[in-house]
A protein has these predicted regions:
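A short, well-ordered alpha-helical element
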Residues: 34-43, 249-265
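Short, charged, solvent-exposed linker or helix-capping segments at domain edges/interfaces
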Residues: 15, 135-138, 224-227
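Single conserved hydrophobic/aromatic residue that forms the stacking wall/gate
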Residues: 268, 273-278
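Binuclear metal-dependent phosphoesterase catalytic core
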Residues: 27, 111-118, 197-261
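N-terminal active-site segment of His-dependent metallophosphoesterases
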Residues: 1-66
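Hydrophobic pocket-lining residues within nucleotide cofactor-binding pockets
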Residues: 9-11, 54, 129, 189, ...
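His/Asp/Glu-rich metal-coordinating catalytic cores
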Residues: 47, 57-217
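Acidic Asp/Glu-based divalent-cation binding sites
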Residues: 53, 87, 275
Length: 278
């Protein structure tokens, strides 16, 4: 069984608000999401797991319809998603009662629930946020059950105000893989067992380095996962060694030369200032 795990897509967000490229960044988020859908379709991936915050805020009905059409375009892939703290399921949310495509399952309940997919021999567990902050780990005590061969868990949180959890304890629950969201930096918490996919595209200048998705396989030999860089944009610290006698013109020239050596889709941040004599 093969899966793609994404999280924190934040559709509708325009990073770097106020800058000339902000609108382009917002469109890049949508385009990266479309690209991941096309990838899942080409590879006939069994599952697309979305571990919360697909949207930056409460989704509009037209946005849900757009996303649903994309999901429907990959009928051989089962899409399972939960809502996170940004797109939580409030009482008047359009998530409630939405008619998803046949290959889509949203685990809408604020309490842990499970969907079984017999043709994939897989059960997927998880719960959605019903408010911005959840101070307890609602997934504590959830264990695989039933007759399915493989068991996956979707989890959004991991900090003090968003379902705080102990990765080691969760990994001992018996799931084949725990797909995490909320933290935007990709990271393997437990090798081949539990990971943050990170934001599909970086959403601010603090999120340095590659962003993308987790690719995984579960079979009789166990679970194997790997992080795959996929984002169009990447933030990178750019450090220039300058002296106190460097003029503004010389500094700008030096900066342009450095930028010319790098890729177009890298976004640069300025780290903490250093002593100009160094």
């Amino acid at each position: 069984m093969r899966f793609i795990h994404i999280a924190d897509v934040h559709l509708g967000m325009q990073p770097d608000a106020g800058f000339p490229w902000s609108e382009e960044r917002g469109e890049a988020i949508w385009e990266s999401f479309r690209r991941i859908i096309r990838l899942a379709g080409r590879e006939k991936t069994d599952f697309l797991l979305i571990a919360g915050d697909l949207f930056q805020c409460q989704p509009l009905l037209r946005e849900l319809k757009e996303v649903n059409d994309l999901f429907a375009s990959i009928p051989e892939t089962i899409v399972v998603l939960i809502a996170g703290n940004h797109d939580y399921v409030k009482r008047e949310s359009f998530y409630r009662g939405f008619d998803w495509a046949d290959n889509v399952v949203m685990l809408l309940s604020p309490e842990p629930e499970c969907v079984e997919v017999p043709e994939k021999k897989t059960a997927v567990y998880g719960c959605s946020y019903d408010k911005k902050e959840i101070l307890e780990n609602r997934l504590d005590g959830v264990r695989p059950e039933g007759k399915m061969k493989y068991h996956l868990l979707l989890a959004h949180g991991g900090d003090a105000r968003h379902m705080p959890w102990n990765p080691g304890r969760m990994a001992q629950a018996g799931f084949d893989y725990i797909a995490c969201g909320h933290i935007h930096k990709p990271g393997i918490l437990i090798p081949d067992k539990m990971a943050y996919a990170g934001a599909l595209e970086p959403t601010d200048e603090t999120q340095l380095g590659p962003h993308g998705y987790i690719r995984g396989t579960v079979d009789e030999h166990g679970t194997r996962i790997q992080f795959v860089p996929f984002a169009r944009y990447e933030y990178e610290d750019l450090v220039l060694n300058v002296t106190e006698d460097l003029t503004q013109y010389a500094l700008e020239t030096k900066l342009k030369q450095e930028l010319a050596l790098r890729e177009d889709c890298l976004l640069y941040t300025s780290p903490s200032p250093r002593d100009p004599k160094t």
